[in-house]
Amino acid sequence: MNSDLTSFDKIEQKIDGSRKISNYIIGGMLTIGGIGFLLASISSYTGRDLLPLGNPSALLFIPQGIIMGAYGVIANLLNFYLWYMVYINFGSGSNSFDKSSKSVEIKRKGLFKDIEVRLDFDEIKSVKLDISEGFNPRRRIALVIKGRKKPLPISGAGELKPLLQVEEEGARLAKFLNVNLEGLK
């Protein structure tokens, strides 16, 4: 959760999506690498150097040129997918908690359409902190909803905030919703 606008009866949280610096860096690397592999493959087929570095026209088209072409196609498909996710800002949205209407509204950008979840305060059982450390650490806040097995995550994907900040946000939200806070040991 990037920014919080808090008043006495309302909390608004903005969630960042896929427009992160790491996605721009990976997208740029995939673009350069994918085009480079395709140009090397075409150079080995035509016998003309299309790249300023190296001598790809000296490569045999079978098997090196074909393999480099396949790598280039795969890289460009991944590249297209990643840039599309960045373009639509996949996963961005907002959380809105309103005490006056006793409702929660969660909005996210999906792949093909937007996702909206509306809940009443009565449906929320507790606020859960899902914290795991190790090789793939995870620190997220989720709502435990009555009648649902899995908690509904409300923090952004891929966010790794300091533990104290996650605990404070979870405690503030649990106090605002007047429910228990789970997950602290």
From Swiss-Prot:
Membrane-traversing stretches: 24-44, 58-78
Tell me what organism the protein belongs to. Answer: Prochlorococcus marinus (strain MIT 9215)
Q: How does it sit in the membrane?
A: Multi-pass membrane protein
- Keywords, A to Z? Membrane, Photosynthesis, Thylakoid, Transmembrane, Transmembrane helix
The cross-references to InterPro entries, in alphabetical order and at most eight, read:
PSI_Ycf4_assembly
Any single GO CC term annotated in Swiss-Prot or TrEMBL for this entry:
photosystem I
Q: Where in the cell is it found?
A: Cellular thylakoid membrane
The protein's name is: Photosystem I assembly protein Ycf4
Q: Which family does it belong to?
A: Belongs to the Ycf4 family.
Under Pfam families, the record lists: Ycf4
**Summary of the function given for this chain in its UniProt record:** Seems to be required for the assembly of the photosystem I complex.
Q: Which GO terms describe its biological process?
A: photosynthesis
Q: What is its main location?
A: membrane
